[in-house]
């Protein structure tokens, strides 16, 4: 492509897929644009709408909790007090369920926001990598030792090998993984506190449900930890292999063409 201006590439890369469209990489640019638009809609439109909807759904139950609590304060009958407490607790559990769901959706929104940011980081790095490759691809042998040293810094090995698109993918994965670790840990702590409070109420069914949520999010957190570690270790191996094979990228020319020397005949040429 003749569109090889660095300032314009970087300027357009501020927009989803812009640098790719500018450099005529339309398929990749279209994929990035579609993914960023979908995540933007989910983070800024759908999630707030869902939270507002749940808040409205919980309002009648919250009002009922207040009504039965007030009635409990105004009664002196033990039988009526027990009945009112049972009704209040039932509505209180419904309100807690809405609160739990809202907390989960908010933490999911934060994780999706991180993936959106990571995707845009990849968008910028990959656009810059396209610009670098358009200027000519280096086929010099790179040092494996230097590649390993740089690879200890996340993305450093890929940048050393001038694989900027891979560096962007690495940063996207690490940003998403470590943010998801933080959000799931926040939910674990939230449910641990909920379980601690509920134990004083002798509500064994609710306590069991909370324990299941704690186990579920601990498993998710551990998966993200392992995922982040695997991505990092893979980036180190990838940097070393790319450095080892860096001088293998010399173009091998293979051509089949007619030859008119000594009569019409086919010829095969291999240029090392």
Residue spans of the language-model regions?
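Short, solvent-exposed beta-strand-terminating loops
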Residues: 42-50, 181-187
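Active-site-surrounding "flap" and adjacent substrate/cofactor-binding loops of secreted or lumenal enzymes
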Residues: 49-64
């Amino acid at each position: 492509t003749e569109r090889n201006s660095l300032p314009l590439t970087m300027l357009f890369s501020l927009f989803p897929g812009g640098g790719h469209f500018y450099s005529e990489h339309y398929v990749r640019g279209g994929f990035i644009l579609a993914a960023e638009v979908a995540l933007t809609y989910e983070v800024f439109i759908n999630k707030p709408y869902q939270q507002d909807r749940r808040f409205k759904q919980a309002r009648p139950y919250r009002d009922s909790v207040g009504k039965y609590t007030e009635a409990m304060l105004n009664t002196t009958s033990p039988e009526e007090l027990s009945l009112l407490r049972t009704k209040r607790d039932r509505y209180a559990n419904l309100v807690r369920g809405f609160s739990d769901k809202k907390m989960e959706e908010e933490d999911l929104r934060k994780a999706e926001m991180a993936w959106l940011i990571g995707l845009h980081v990849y968008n910028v790095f990959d656009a810059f990598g396209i610009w670098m490759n358009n200027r000519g691809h280096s086929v010099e042998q790179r040092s494996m030792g230097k590649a390993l040293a740089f690879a200890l810094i996340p993305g450093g090995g890929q940048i050393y090998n001038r694989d900027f698109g891979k560096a962007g993918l690495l940063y996207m994965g690490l940003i998403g993984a470590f943010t998801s670790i933080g959000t799931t840990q926040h939910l674990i702590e939230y449910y641990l506190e909920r379980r601690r409070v509920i134990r004083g109420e002798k509500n064994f069914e609710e306590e069991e449900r909370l324990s299941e949520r704690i186990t579920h999010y601990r498993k998710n957190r551990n998966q993200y930890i392992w995922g982040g570690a695997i991505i990092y270790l893979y980036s180190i191996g990838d940097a070393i292999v790319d450095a080892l094979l860096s001088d293998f990228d010399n173009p091998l020319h293979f051509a089949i063409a007619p030859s008119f020397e000594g009569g019409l005949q086919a010829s095969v040429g291999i240029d090392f």
